[in-house]
């Protein structure tokens, strides 16, 4: 009984905000008899284009899948180099490596954890075939400067927007400048358990993505049924099985309709955290100086032992004993075993400093005032205040 009560009282780092709308959306798809990729995918893609201002959107089974086929569509392969921050989820690095290319990991700004144009430019070589900036924690990277580099050197930019549904940069939603990849993973601002979407204004690129995500065929099963096309399509080039079922797409659509309200609640909680941190030794990330709207996917603090009297890992363990979950976004990719052994001499000082200290606090739309007070009380207790 005691263990069951402890689990029921546990405050997770994140929890999806699901309700009657999502249940109704799933029922509609189940009742339709078409549960795999179909009309709900088309609705989701159109709705996401309205959000970002792009001409094309391609729904996929995950943002990782989207990154894989986006790199393939650019022709990334053996001997090519792709610039990315090490402060990112390892899936980006994995996709680069699996295509035979070389990831070129660069440092980030110490206080925003954003990749900087200076670090990107210093890493450009004749072999550089793509730049992947990360919109970190819900804030945007400095796109004007990054796209200027891409244009100057003739290098495509693929925006990692997994954290950035609802994020804007200088008045435009992330993705509006070119190509961006969003995530619908369970902890993201909108979710359908697993899924993602790639936005672009390039019709040829979008066509390649659609083919690569579905076996290399020119059409999917719904296209063949609804469009009266030949029952057997031809393989244009070898592809993958990365399509998103309509069950997932319907949930994502229901979530997308709530995006403004969900993100407003996230922003309100983040503002409370910022106010509370004024009396605590833990350091939140700094906000970018350029005009933006923050989606507040994560609220991250840095736990420096010299300043706080406790290590990050000890803080996370202590919060867990108090029934409070936390996250680590991210352990720097170049410190992971495979990449540590592949790049043994790589040092990225600001990335490494943060990788040892960052901690994501609970932040989700259904978080209550009581939940918030519980986190802050625990942090005061741990800090000895």
Curated annotation (Swiss-Prot):
Pathway: Nucleotide-sugar biosynthesis; UDP-4-deoxy-4-formamido-beta-L-arabinose biosynthesis; UDP-4-deoxy-4-formamido-beta-L-arabinose from UDP-alpha-D-glucuronate: step 2/3; Bacterial outer membrane biogenesis; lipopolysaccharide biosynthesis. Inhibited by L-cycloserine. SUPFAM superfamilies: PLP-dependent transferases. The modification N6-(pyridoxal phosphate)lysine is found at residue 188. One of its GO terms (molecular function) is UDP-4-amino-4-deoxy-L-arabinose aminotransferase. It comes from the Bacteria. Induction: Induced by BasR. GO terms for biological process: lipid A biosynthetic process; lipopolysaccharide biosynthetic process; polysaccharide biosynthetic process; response to antibiotic. InterPro entries: ArnB_NH2Trfase, DegT/StrS_aminotransferase, PyrdxlP-dep_Trfase, PyrdxlP-dep_Trfase_major, PyrdxlP-dep_Trfase_small. CDD domains: AHBA_syn. Keywords: Aminotransferase, Antibiotic resistance, Lipid A biosynthesis, Lipid biosynthesis, Lipid metabolism, Lipopolysaccharide biosynthesis, Pyridoxal phosphate, Transferase. The active site is at residue 188. Its cofactor is pyridoxal 5'-phosphate. Pfam families: DegT_DnrJ_EryC1. Its EC number is 2.6.1.87. It is an enzyme of class 2 (transferase). It catalyses: UDP-4-amino-4-deoxy-beta-L-arabinose + 2-oxoglutarate = UDP-beta-L-threo-pentopyranos-4-ulose + L-glutamate. One of its GO terms (cellular component) is membrane. Belongs to the DegT/DnrJ/EryC1 family. ArnB subfamily. Catalyzes the conversion of UDP-4-keto-arabinose (UDP-Ara4O) to UDP-4-amino-4-deoxy-L-arabinose (UDP-L-Ara4N). The modified arabinose is attached to lipid A and is required for resistance to polymyxin and cationic antimicrobial peptides. Homodimer. This is UDP-4-amino-4-deoxy-L-arabinose--oxoglutarate aminotransferase. The gene is arnB.
